[in-house]
Amino acid sequence: MSQAPLVLVDGSSYLYRAFHALPPLTTSKGLPTGAVKGVLNMLKSLRKQYPDSPFAVVFDAKGGTFRDDMYAEYKANRPSMPDDMRVQIEPLHQSVIALGFPLLCVEGVEADDVIGTLARSSAAADRPVVISTGDKDMAQLVDGHITLVNTMTGSSMDIEGVKEKFGVAPEQIIDYLALMGDSSDNIPGVPGIGPKTASGLLVGVNGGLKELYEQLDIVPTLPIRGAKTLPAKLEEHKEMAFLSYQLATIKIDVPLDVGLDDLHLIEPDREKLLELYTQLEFKSWFDEIQRDAKRVELKAAPVAEDIVEAAPAAPAETTYTTILDQATFDAWLKKLNDAKLFAFDTETTGIDAQQAQLVGVSFAVQPHEAAYIPLTHSYIGAPQQLDRDTVLLALKPLLQDPSKLKVGQHAKFDMNILANCAIGGDPANGISVRGIAFDTMLESYVLNSTATRHDMDSLAKKYLDYDTVSFQDIAGKGAKQLTFDQIPLEQAGPYAAEDADVTLRLHQALHAQLTAIPSLASVLTDIEIPLVPVLARIERQGALVDAQLLGVQSIELGNKMVELERQAFEIAGEAFNLGSPKQLGAILYEKLGLPVLKKTGKGQASTAEEVLAKLAEDDYPLPKVLMQYRSMSKLKSTYTDRLPEQINPRTGRVHTSYHQAVAATGRLSSSDPNLQNIPVRTAEGRRIRQAFVAPKGYKLLAADYSQIELRIMAHLSKDEGLMNAFRNDLDVHTATAAEVFKVELAEVTSNQRRSAKAINFGLIYGMGAQKLGKDIGVDTKTAKAYIDVYFARYPGVREYMERTRAQAADQGYVETFFGRRLYLPDINSNKPQERAAAERTAINAPMQGTAADIIKKAMVLVDNWLTASGLDAKVILQVHDELVLEVREDLVAEVSEKIREHMSAAAQLDVPLVVDVGVGDNWDEAH
């Protein structure tokens, strides 16, 4: 039987990565615990994976090391350890020991050196070794006995894995690090040499640093970009390169007080773990130990008739009040006015905020205590309720007072409901809620935008370990589902009160985590929360659409679909149902013999849109026709047929809903209708925009940021060439074309500019040479040459991309200019396709996310100005980087100037933000 491997865990590496890469957690008292939980989860996973193995969990000791003596600047660039990480070290150490793992800290050296010593010692005794780490330095230890695993990503690395990832063998890793340096440890390396150049040099000389310096004369002949300039650079920084070699070398001879025989697991200390889990509020782990202990007791106990299961811990006692009398209402109104912060929620007859009717309002001022004020429950036998208008008039000063701070869950919906509540039947007499300080949906979203659900029920389970009463529990399902006004107060009251209570409790849990990361707290308070009332106003304003024009377009699209269907039948040689995947698959793959690019989960050849798009790119006629048909069908069903049905009978307008907590990058999305998906590059898509019209006496004004993501790229990369192009107001695509095609600016053709535009935007989205070649109609080799020329002209862009990939892999997330985080769970995946996709996201997300933050800040600035000025102009739509306003004709010039001014001031970048403004009678004309 093969020997179980020695498992060596790089505790310090995992502590850092868990703290930075995982969403933060805190106890109810504000103690940070997320990193502790992340590392312990990893250790538990390892223990299950290697149940028979000896273990050591190794952490850095306090104080300096021999490397600090060698180089005073070693790790000097690192910010001091965050306090929220520092306070987690001691409970983590205690938890590791209580779980039964040997824990090692050795003064004067780093955890890497202790691990290196133990690993080499074990390998010398022919025992296999698994090093659990996320640190690339450890790759130098890999050999026939030693393997690296990264439990946080599920990846592993042997000798071949090292070669695949770094382009060099394990024995060359120290040389590799010596050349490129390591920014995280402030190892200097040779300036200007990155990962690809370092590996290219070492492979080129078939050796290490020593061999490289002995063969500098052959370096100019190596197939490396800029090879001719490298010998001088290497010679100039030779001393630093060899110092870097020493700094990057892991010691394998550290004197230790323990031997391999001392590194065995022991039984967990349950009492200590219960104490720690209570302190850290790891409720599920606490319960798990209790259950295990109970099972052991029951198994060991003699058979008896009176053994009784232990009762579950009682939940905190709640006091939920349904208010039906004036005295109770007055008492609660005073309580709300005296509170520093209160939670509120509305109950309604539906989920369309522009048409639903208000049924009741709930409030909470402290955890586990809440009240519901029913207003219009009308089921048979419903008790008498307080007068709706009297209650709303009493609540109005409180809800409209900006100094009375409020928290909601998806507060925009409640704001719209109350704004539309029409007190006394007067549509203009609503409640304009002010003082929204927090929104738990947005707090959750800002903490981790890649999480899929930010609804109250999901958040309560995740952050409070609490199961809420669902709407279906009290209203039923399907066609027989009751509206809220028909639900008896015995059920409706506690349900509604719970909504307010849980909202307040969620805020307390989420706010503690956000304040631990100031940059995220700033994103919430400076960007997301101020935007809530702005979006609410835009939604209520709505947009005017020409239903008659849409009807004409619908007929035209239908006629085009009939013609495309005829063409499809002609190509196929028979009639078939274009909407049937089965029939379509038979035609494409069996009859016409097209290549099968992808299969469904059931093993059938796929006819999905991305498959048809790829086949259409490859010039197969039927997929081209099918793609056109599907495009027309989508426009017809989603817009020309549907938009007239979405006109609100009360306002005569279409009211889209904007979503702040959906897109991971921070971008807004919309629904009913989805404005983002109206195509702008096709004539049919542009015609749909023609149906969004200005009322008589008004114009539509469209204000759009010009090339905003490229400008953000220039700012983030600090590339002088790109920044100068924007600072000098050059057409950046023309400037790029002049560089790539080696012509003067005045000689650039429209085709060359189009190709340069594809290069500029393609590289932002991580496009490779093959895809670029297809897009601009050249072979892959030529496209690669264009990319090489581009990076030679804009070297800062390449450096930014490499730096961003490395930082993302190291910390597990990227950030926007304003500090918004995007977590990348696949950035260290051992599946190349997943990792490559995450790397593309890492490069693009800071730009797309920063653009999203900028337009959000611009919306707030514009709204503040419009509100203060009192001008007859209103924002009616927001799409991507564009705002659309409805402006009285005589104010167009003034508003155009001010819109440019405010949108340009939304961010201070190293290049100017330029805003293009267009005006017309419809949305399309305004472009």
How would you label these PLM feature ranges?
Residues 2-132, 136-158, 240-243, 249-257, ...:
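Noncatalytic, basic helical substrate-engagement surface that gates or grips nucleic-acid strands
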Residues 5-7, 11, 17-56, 72-73, ...:
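Conserved RNase H-like, two-metal-ion catalytic cores of nucleic-acid enzymes
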Residues 22, 73-88, 139-168, 230-232, ...:
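Short alpha-helix plus adjacent loop in nuclease-associated cores
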Residues 129, 344, 409, 438-440, ...:
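Conserved catalytic palm subdomain of right-hand nucleotidyl-transferase polymerases, strongest
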Residues 147, 152, 169-172, 179-246, ...:
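Accessory alpha-helical DNA-binding modules that contact the DNA backbone or grooves
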Residues 237-381, 426-429, 433, 451, ...:
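Conserved "right-hand" nucleotidyltransferase catalytic core of DNA-directed polymerases
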Residues 482-485, 533, 537-540, 648-651, ...:
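Conserved catalytic core of nucleic-acid polymerases
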Residues 559-566, 570-624, 792-840, 844, ...:
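C-terminal polymerase-core module
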